[in-house]
Amino acid sequence: DKYQQAGIEHFFFGQIDNPLSPTCCPELIGFHSLTDSAVTLQAIAKQDAQDKTGNIVQMDGRIQMIEYTEMPPQLAKQITPDGQLNFWAANIAVHIFKTSFLKQLAQDPTALPFHTAHKTVAHIDQLGNQIHPTEPNAIKFERFIFDSLSVSPKTTVIEADRNFVFAAVKNHAAASFNTVDTCQQAISALHRNWLIAAGVQVDMDITVEIDPYWARNAQQVGERPDLPQTIKTDIFLTSSRSTAR
């Protein structure tokens, strides 16, 4: 009600620790508006059948989501004749909703089903001792916003390049992807590409980071009056100055 009273027709929702999440991306909002969708979400191609991402699928003529914990392994590993994953579309938790659709969901307490999640929960036993179990010992009931797809009158899925929109931090440092290090590398690579597109000569083996107050996308980088011509050392471009590290 508050959003509708303020004249807000669309609501962006991004819910995971992904610094590359394209908040209120103009192109995504444009597709959402042009298609007159109740829900628009962004997808990327999965790196592996066992990626810990939701699977965007079509069931009974509707776009729906199957959480990776609920996806049978034999289905996740299905391959098409050309060798690609059959269920390739990964949800990265980037959504745009019509506020009128969200209002409908809020008015129906049964619109979103419950999911069970097995959790490892510390607790105090009958003797007052604090117990820290190593195996799941509790069941948590959860609701997920992506289940709204099953009742959405119209849903649009937009595929994006992983390198431009997704660098989540989900794994420990020893993992090969979705770590703090791979996230920092992805941010630097994206910002380097923005600078190169704007005509800046940037060494490929340095770290580059751009403060969002300095520029939020490649277009804004190209419009900066203080854009450097060359960058040869690690740099953090801020709203006030360019700081060499």
List the predicted regions and their residue ranges.
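Catalytic core of tubulin tyrosine ligase-like
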Residues: 2-3, 7-12, 20-201
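C-terminal non-catalytic accessory extensions
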Residues: 211-245
